[in-house]
């Protein structure tokens, strides 16, 4: 049985961890280094660190914060935000990240995925896909720049393409579900995870314990990501893992 992963996400804006609803109305949650260290001790399987303002503002990712965060961790760290080229990949990996997540830059330059996979290995390359259901309800479009720009690309087709280009994992966020706490987007996650043969991390919408069980049971997602639930101490990672174990899932305790 494949061990399912529970992953807290640190959305970082101007050096602080923030959380919003549907990608807006951001609240300050705290210091990224302290929060990452806390989750590491709590039993998180990995941590995702996203500098959500980096791409939009055209800034390089805050390498010093990444380095300080990585120094405190004994679990894999995925870093994204403002990664535009192979040099950015190299700099962030040298700062201590285990994997790099690309989103907007991969859309603008799909060859970046292929080149990064060739240079550093597919296991280092995560493609983040932010998807939103089309107005006609027939499928999902990919959004970039922190959910500000609709690319018009079909999310399922894009997932298929990034796998072919060499991505080792997909971080899939439902913009419709994000921040609502009404549960992960089962339909969207299922459609993507059954289309590709690489791991898919489900993101967006988790609000209670049962939502973790639902997404891991009713889709082929390999991991569940959450932010506000953990940041605001509504649930602990230990509670989630104990619940999943009771539900029959293989988890690392």
Swiss-Prot record:
Subcellular location: Cytoplasm
Reactions catalysed, as given in the entry: 5-[(5-phospho-1-deoxy-D-ribulos-1-ylimino)methylamino]-1-(5-phospho-beta-D-ribosyl)imidazole-4-carboxamide + L-glutamine = D-erythro-1-(imidazol-4-yl)glycerol 3-phosphate + 5-amino-1-(5-phospho-beta-D-ribosyl)imidazole-4-carboxamide + L-glutamate + H(+)
Gene Ontology BP, a term: L-histidine biosynthetic process
GO cellular component: cytoplasm
GO molecular function: imidazoleglycerol-phosphate synthase activity; lyase activity
The keyword Transit peptide appears for this protein: no
Keywords carried by this UniProt record: Amino-acid biosynthesis, Cytoplasm, Histidine biosynthesis, Lyase
Subunit structure: Heterodimer of HisH and HisF.
Described purpose of this protein according to its UniProt entry: IGPS catalyzes the conversion of PRFAR and glutamine to IGP, AICAR and glutamate. The HisF subunit catalyzes the cyclization activity that produces IGP and AICAR from PRFAR using the ammonia provided by the HisH subunit.
Name of protein: Imidazole glycerol phosphate synthase subunit HisF
Originating organism: Clostridium botulinum (strain 657 / Type Ba4)
Lineage, top ranks: Bacteria, Bacillati, Bacillota, Clostridia, Eubacteriales
Name of encoding gene: hisF
